[in-house]
């Protein structure tokens, strides 16, 4: 399957956040549905952050905050990081409360001259002290970018040179297409890669915040409608007709935070999917809808891997489904561009006849991004045997290890 839909990088803008999200963030990394995925640790300073001499704030505040004047200039960080004149330079310094305590940390980015325009990303604590403590370092992001999210995580963007949109392109023709998110983990003592819960219309928080800004400016207003978002998912990911019928099961109102919507195909078999959606960052005042799960009712389920798990290839996909002629359907692994990078035919348990049964399939995939993990989707497609169209599907968000 080729890329179903590609959402270009756009500048993210501000969106309103409710008080319960603020309270939610105070828990840092524990007990948060935004951080339940197994994560990839990154290089870090093993020393426990010392906040006694750090720059304190009155409270934990969501999003970027003004840096203390003494650390806000790029020149302050040249000697700390060790930039080289004519080779590298400090590109940006931004501050926020990133580790779950009311103390400012600094996100410092370093840009390299020459082909690739590579970016290194650093996070420091004790930023006004004589010896700031490095908490995180991520190097070599091709044409990279980094910023602080409205959820106090680190968002990065870079070029995946081997991806479907950049492979065989000249250097001037490549674009940012690989987006990652890193969140502070007390247990790991550093920032670890986590998954954004969304499947569609955005796979990553970087893209979602950019989409929110576009919607705030009056573009793509359908993303404010749960029905239309569920329909767009069916059109783009199952190739259903735009006239597929949607029905609100719960929520979905102008001030609701969650919604469940069924979408019914117009094909002769008339298959149905159930789409679960939530508002971006819990913002009921104009927050866009993000589909977080797709279910097939009694037709099929996926029991493994767990939603938002960290996968390695080959991955075992297990579940249940209705068998007809020995076949249940197809399992696909979709990468960060919704391209298929692994697939397997799914058959029922040996000896099972027609009807509902369990299955287990080993799926080998190969990610085009080899420098870490990427956000993707595991999909179970069930075909309509009357015309060969897709009757229904199960989709789960995952973190795809290289």
What annotation goes with each model-predicted range?
Residues 99-110, 152-158:
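Acidic/hydrophobic-patterned starts of short beta strands in beta-sheet-rich repeat architectures
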Residues 136-140, 246-250, 341-353:
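Solvent-exposed serine/threonine-rich low-complexity stretches and specific carbohydrate-binding patches
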Residues 299-302, 309-402:
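Ser/Thr-rich low-complexity repeats and stalk/linker segments
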């Amino acid at each position: 399957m080729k890329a179903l839909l590609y959402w270009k990088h756009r500048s993210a803008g501000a969106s309103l956040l409710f008080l319960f999200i603020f309270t939610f963030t105070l828990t840092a990394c524990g007990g948060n549905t935004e951080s339940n995925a197994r994560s990839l640790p990154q290089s870090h300073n093993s020393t426990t952050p010392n906040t006694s001499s750090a720059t304190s704030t009155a409270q934990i505040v969501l999003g970027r905050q003004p840096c203390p004047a003494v650390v806000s200039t790029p020149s302050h960080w040249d000697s700390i990081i060790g930039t080289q004149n004519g080779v590298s330079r400090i590109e940006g310094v931004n501050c926020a409360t990133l580790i779950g305590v009311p103390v400012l940390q600094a996100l410092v980015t370093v840009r390299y001259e020459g082909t690739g325009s590579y970016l290194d990303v650093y996070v420091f604590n004790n930023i006004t002290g004589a010896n700031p403590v490095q908490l995180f370092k991520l190097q070599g992001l091709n044409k990279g970018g980094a910023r602080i999210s409205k959820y106090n995580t680190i968002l990065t963007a870079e070029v995946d040179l081997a991806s479907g949109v950049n492979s065989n392109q000249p250097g001037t023709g490549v674009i940012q297409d690989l987006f990652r998110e890193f969140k502070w983990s007390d247990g790991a003592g550093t920032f670890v890669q986590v998954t954004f819960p969304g499947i569609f219309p955005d796979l990553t928080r970087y893209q979602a915040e950019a989409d929110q800004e576009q919607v705030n400016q009056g573009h793509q207003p359908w993303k404010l409608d749960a029905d239309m978002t569920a329909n767009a998912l069916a059109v783009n990911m199952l190739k259903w007709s735009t006239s597929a019928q949607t029905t609100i099961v719960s929520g979905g109102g102008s001030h609701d935070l969650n919604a469940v919507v069924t979408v019914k195909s117009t094909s002769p078999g008339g298959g149905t999917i159930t789409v679960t959606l939530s508002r971006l960052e819990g913002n009921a005042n104009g927050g866009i809808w993000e589909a977080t799960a797709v279910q097939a009712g009694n037709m099929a389920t996926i029991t493994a891997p767990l939603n938002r798990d960290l996968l390695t290839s080959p991955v075992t996909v297990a579940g249940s489904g209705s068998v007809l002629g020995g076949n249940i359907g197809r399992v696909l692994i979709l990468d960060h561009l919704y391209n298929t990078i692994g697939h397997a035919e799914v058959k029922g348990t040996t000896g099972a006849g027609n009807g509902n049964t369990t299955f287990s399939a080993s799926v080998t995939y190969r990610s085009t991004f080899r420098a870490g993990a990427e956000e993707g989707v595991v999909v179970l497609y069930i075909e309509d045997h009357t015309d060969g169209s897709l009757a229904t599907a199960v989709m789960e968000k995952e973190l795809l290890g290289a």
